[in-house]
């Protein structure tokens, strides 16, 4: 039995029993806590938990899912796959245990000729929660199974909850016995390999309390409405019904496996276990990547895009290990498309886009593999030869930095060779690289051409910084640099670097951005674009000559933009305060790893490995603003380095220290750091700290961003305006806005679900009218009709299948056309008798699509075509009738 046929039988079975057929949701979940849709129940969670009233009492679906938690197990077991389809039937306060169990047993054991799945009852076993006597008795009565074939298991396997207070309940699982060749007797409680779980029935009937783990929680009582949530693994049933060994060999996956084996010249199943695993990885990952890209995911270095990129790269490497070093995606992805398009036509309509994404990713990564694999192989061999078990961190860094080899791939390949990787050394080298990148950025800012130019000017003496105590300093021009070379003068319109004997302008350092301002002198005005320290002790001012002419040796007065400096001081002192607050809340392990501040804005990176909760963010913000309200004194002093360390001053800005360092105290010892930046005199001068963002900047670092001073007040004013407008528009007091908006969102989602259900019912309401339009072409019943305008091709497909199945066992063909998504689409469905008479849906769909100005095709029982000419729909339907005979 083909996978698509099992899919169809599932939906038909439950549709005939009053369930609303709900199309699969996207793999990209609406739930912000999930990267992907990971289970069939995910789209129904609001209904199952009671957050939103269900728009229907019963529902059924076949849901696309992605799980990559066990990605390393793919190909090694018969059951692990990254993409899978979960068949589900759901009851929202309607039927409960008895009906759910009866439905399951009926569908599984009804003969294939009567629309069931045709499992022999003697091959089926059942597990129930050990204390659920009700379920055990129902199974005994409904199935007639012997007592020993209904096994009671504990909470860890047969009790469902969300892991937190809320709905919970026992579950019952149905297993298929593959026979003694696969393991020992004794049922599912004894051996997982022999007994394959195919269906899980969850009986949501209780309210659970606080607790940890799978079984350490209290049951508080019954739920007011009892729900049913079941899941049957489509791929698992398919491999059992198709008589193959695992899910990689079913009709939707095996074609890719065979094509990969053909490309590699290594037949599948020839006892070469490692090669078979790699072929299964290719088959699984190609299908998963194709489905992800069809649902809009694109390769990237973070989030969903990174998961996709990893799947694609693992596929490339698996083919590489099979001996194929050329591009294979152009041969593999069309095969997967053809295997999946009958169930998901969007796979074909989106293929031009998705295939180009895949092919480009493969081309890029092949270059990486060519360069990096030989180096890694050599390093692994040398490590093993030396009797070591850990690959050096500098090797992993070289692969990452020079060849673009992702660290997760290095870890994976090293593990395959029985080695670990010195991750700590790798992380240190990455941190050093970031520091060098920062230095390179500084070099670009100062337009470095030859350090000797700066060194020569440095020989004249260090630049004296006066900006701690004044915003205006008189000095003289010691040197000029234009395009990296010394110059005697700069004229109006030129960009130059100016070296002064003394300056009030702060050069970028310690995370603080450079000051803005001007330099003026006799007959000239210079706008300061940037201020840097190209060599130790020398300050370079990058300027635009606004007017006049400036030459070496002339007097010069540096003028700091007072407003900018005020904002910069607020931000830098605010950084120290937030850092102290972070450590107060999170502990001493949360220490600063980087920062950047400029007028009105700061960001602070700190060592921490998980996101901060909203409550933690609020606490940090409150402690910070409390320090501002206390108007703490800010003092600076210069001390010997050893004395500063003895006082507990923290070294943060990553520069090499001299014997004497500058210590900044805020509120005495409350905050004490080594710092060369500019600061307010008292904390109240900061005004306000407004934490606006918290995010990840690596596996062990987080980043907070904040507005300070005037910018913080401006941001709050904008928020206040927005809140006021919302309050007015929604006629709701502002303190009730969150609840009101949540209610509106819930109502909107409920309305959308009701619309979907209404549209599905509206489609099915057309069935009787179409049945009355049946005609005959020879011995074949024919329904060829224009269905008007529908939301999606899925609606048209459901309508065609339903009409076909209602036409009975005599030869029947249904051809329906409609405008779906603004384009003409035709669906052709044939029953077995029509196919026996030589009428195939694929050929008819291709005929109709040709008239519509497009293309089409599919399988003998169900096919789709489309085009661009909607006016040709009548002619296309006529062509189908003519082609039948």
Curated annotation (Swiss-Prot):
Assigned EC number: 6.1.1.7
Key word Translocase present: no
Keyword GTP-binding: no
PROSITE patterns to which the protein is assigned, alphabetical: AA_TRNA_LIGASE_II_ALA
InterPro entries on file: aa-tRNA-synth_II/BPL/LPL (IPR045864), Ala-tRNA-lgiase_IIc (IPR002318), Ala-tRNA-ligase_IIc_anticod-bd (IPR018162), Ala-tRNA-synth_IIc_core (IPR018165), Ala-tRNA-synth_IIc_N (IPR018164), Ala-tRNA_ligase (IPR050058), Ala_tRNA_ligase_euk/bac (IPR023033), DHHA1_dom (IPR003156)
Amino acids binding Zn(2+): 572, 576, 675, 679
Disulfide bridge map: none
Protein role: Catalyzes the attachment of alanine to tRNA(Ala) in a two-step reaction: alanine is first activated by ATP to form Ala-AMP and then transferred to the acceptor end of tRNA(Ala). Also edits incorrectly charged Ser-tRNA(Ala) and Gly-tRNA(Ala) via its editing domain.
Protein's name according to its UniProt entry: Alanine--tRNA ligase
Source organism (scientific name): Leifsonia xyli subsp. xyli (strain CTCB07)
Lineage of the organism: Bacteria, Bacillati, Actinomycetota, Actinomycetes, Micrococcales
Gene: alaS
């Amino acid at each position: 039995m083909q996978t698509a046929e099992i899919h169809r039988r599932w939906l038909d079975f439950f549709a005939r029993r009053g369930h609303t057929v709900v199309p699969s949701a996207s793999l990209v979940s609406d739930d912000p806590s999930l990267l992907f849709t990971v289970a069939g129940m995910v789209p129904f969670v609001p209904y199952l938990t009671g957050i939103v009233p269900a728009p229907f009492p019963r529902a059924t679906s076949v849901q696309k899912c992605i799980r990559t938690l066990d990605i390393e197990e793919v190909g090694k077991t018969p059951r692990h796959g990254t993409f899978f389809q979960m068949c589900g039937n759901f009851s929202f306060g309607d039927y409960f245990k008895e009906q759910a169990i009866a439905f399951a047993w009926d569908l599984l054991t009804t003969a294939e000729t009567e629309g069931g799945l045709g499992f022999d009852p003697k091959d089926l076993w059942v597990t129930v929660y050990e204390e659920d006597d009700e379920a055990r008795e129902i199974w005994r009565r409904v199935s007639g199974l012997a007592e020993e074939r209904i096994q009671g298991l504990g909470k860890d396997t047969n009790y469902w909850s969300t892991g937190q207070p809320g709905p919970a309940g026992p579950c019952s699982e149905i297993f298929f016995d593959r026979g003694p060749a696969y393991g020992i007797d004794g049922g599912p409680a004894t051996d997982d390999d022999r007994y394959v779980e195919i269906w899980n029935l969850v009986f949501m009937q209780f309210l659970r309390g606080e607790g940890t783990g799978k079984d350490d929680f209290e049951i508080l009582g019954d739920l007011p409405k009892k729900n049913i949530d079941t899941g049957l693994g489509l791929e698992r049933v398919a491999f059992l019904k198709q008589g193959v060994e695992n899910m990689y060999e079913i009709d939707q996956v095996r074609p890719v496996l065979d094509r990969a084996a053909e490309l590699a010249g290594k037949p599948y199943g020839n006892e070469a276990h490692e090669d078979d695993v790699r072929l299964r990885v290719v088959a699984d990952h190609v299908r998963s990547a194709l489905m992800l890209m069809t649902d809009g995911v694109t390769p990237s270095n973070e989030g969903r895009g990174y998961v996709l990129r990893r799947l694609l790269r693992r596929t490339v490497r698996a083919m590489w290990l099979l001996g194929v070093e050329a591009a294979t995606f152009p041969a593999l992805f069309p095969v997967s498309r053809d295997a999946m398009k009958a169930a998901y036509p969007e796979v074909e309509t989106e293929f031009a886009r998705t295939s180009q994404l895949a092919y480009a990713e493969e081309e890029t990564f092949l270059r990486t593999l060519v360069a990096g694999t030989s180096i890694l192989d050599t390093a692994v061999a040398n490590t093993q030869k030396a009797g070591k078990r850990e690959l050096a961190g500098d090797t992993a860094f070289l692969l990452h930095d020079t060849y673009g080899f992702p660290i997760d791939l290095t870890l994976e390949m090293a593990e395959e060779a029985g080695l670990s990787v010195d991750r700590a050394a790798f992380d240190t080298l990455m941190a050093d690289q970031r520091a060098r990148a920062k230095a390179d950025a500084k070099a670009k800012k100062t337009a470095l051409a030859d350090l000797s130019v700066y060194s020569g000017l440095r020989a004249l003496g260090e630049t004296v910084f006066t900006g701690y105590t004044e915003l205006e300093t008189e000095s003289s021009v010691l040197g000029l640099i234009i395009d990296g070379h010394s110059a005697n003068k700069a004229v109006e319109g030129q960009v130059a670097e100016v070296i002064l004997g003394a300056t009030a302008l702060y050069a970028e350092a310690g995370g603080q951005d450079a000051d803005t301002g001007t330099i003026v002198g006799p007959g000239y005005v210079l706008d300061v674009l940037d201020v840097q320290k190209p060599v130790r002790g020398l300050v370079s001012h990058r300027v635009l000559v606004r007017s006049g002419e400036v030459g070496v040796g002339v007097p010069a007065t540096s003028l700091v933009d007072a407003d900018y400096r005020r904002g910069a001081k607020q931000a830098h002192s605010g950084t120290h305060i937030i850092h102290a607050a972070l450590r107060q809340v999170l502990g001493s392990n949360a220490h600063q790893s980087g920062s950047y501040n400029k007028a009105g804005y700061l960001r602070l990176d700190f060592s921490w490995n998980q996101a901060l909760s909203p409550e933690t963010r609020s606490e940090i913000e409150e402690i910070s603003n409390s320090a501002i309200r206390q108007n703490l004194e800010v003092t600076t002093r210069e001390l010997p380095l050893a004395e500063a360390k003895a006082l507990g001053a923290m070294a943060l800005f990553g520069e090499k220290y001299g014997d004497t360092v500058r210590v900044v105290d805020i509120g005495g010892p409350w905050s004490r750091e080594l710092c060369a930046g500019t600061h307010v005199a008292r904390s109240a001068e900061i005004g306000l700290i407004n934490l606006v963002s918290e995010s990840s900047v690596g596996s062990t670092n987080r980043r907070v961003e904040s507005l300070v001073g005037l910018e913080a007040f401006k941001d709050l004013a904008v928020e206040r305006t927005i809140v006021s407008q919302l309050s007015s528009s929604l006629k709701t007091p502002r303190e009730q806005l969150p609840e009101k908006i949540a209610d509106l969102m819930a109502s909107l989602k409920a309305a959308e679900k009701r619309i979907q259900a209404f549209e599905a019912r509206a489609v099915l309401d057309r069935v009787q009218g179409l049945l009355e339009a049946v005609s005959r072409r020879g011995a074949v019943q024919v329904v060829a009709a224009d269905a008007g305008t529908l939301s999606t091709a899925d609606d048209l497909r459901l309508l065609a299948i339903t009409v076909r199945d209602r036409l009975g066992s005599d030869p029947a063909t249904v051809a329906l056309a409609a405008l779906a998504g603004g384009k003409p689409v035709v669906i052709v469905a044939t029953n077995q008798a029509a196919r026996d008479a030589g009428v195939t849906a694929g050929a008819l769909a291709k005929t109709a699509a040709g008239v519509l100005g497009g293309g089409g095709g599919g399988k003998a029982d169900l096919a789709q075509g489309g085009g661009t000419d909607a006016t040709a729909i009548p002619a296309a339907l006529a062509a189908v009738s003519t082609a039948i005979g």
